[in-house]
């Protein structure tokens, strides 16, 4: 179900690579809107634009704006001829052809087909940090950089939340700050520096084609949930962890934790992490948590121990000292916010993410 509106662009707001914020007059009222120029071009003041306002009407948190679907005044010119025949956002009105790392027209096709480690599906022990929430990304990088500032890091964005890479202010800020050496959008996600058809290919390309020392895998902004055991988008982190295991990488889990979430199921260790570890994970993974004696960490470690005991895989709890984590987090070039709470309001999710980054650095030769 889509709620359609048309309006007139009144103001061009903040712009960055891949996204432009607008103020659009709809039915006489100012409406915040977002245009992704690679999809719909760059609107100008006075243009009539067609908007999808469904998420805005429902008050869904991550978006907070209408989405420009088309510019009725000046449709963008045809793009220049370019290689690539893999379609993403398939069979939607905004489907597009991209050049993926794997396909025949790619300069990396031969490596993706002939490289012995790629063909064998062998990450050769590359650390892969896996997080449920997109907001964990800067904290992971902060911890990693504090321990190994010269490590080459790639971010793989999966397709279980936002599909356009350009939707993320956070990722754009990390790229601009030089904190990410490369980005790959996998599956139906699109718009990263590189495109991949599968997470498996993305991981192998990060290691053997793009020269990454560490990969961080997380969905984009817009985590979906339903207050049920199996109906939430972050469940796919279990599939990613299993992929890392199959490909002989070293999986490092960022457990989802909170000391202040008003929902009991997410207080302490989230039931999301418990479900992934106890019901989905089939291989090995290191689950990093502070060794602090202060709340909520003893409770979180007890919850993790229970999940590990019930697991069909072989997860391992790694308890690390958290001294200096605050200093690591203070270096972030982008604001730290998770589920509407800053690091000042609740540092726990960022502490676990930073320690996961430190642990990944410790796994490097």
Kindly give the residue locations of the regions a language model identified:
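Phosphate-binding glycine-rich loops and their immediate beta-loop-alpha structural context
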Residues: 99-196
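Flexible, glycine-rich phosphate/dinucleotide-binding loops
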Residues: 58, 162, 260
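Non-transmembrane, aqueous-exposed alpha-helical and coiled segments at domain scale
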Residues: 2-26, 145-150, 165, 169-218, ...
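Accessory terminal and edge-of-domain segments that mediate assembly/interaction
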Residues: 39-47, 63, 69-83, 127-131, ...
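Extended, charged alpha/beta regions that create polyanion-binding interfaces
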Residues: 1-125, 148-152
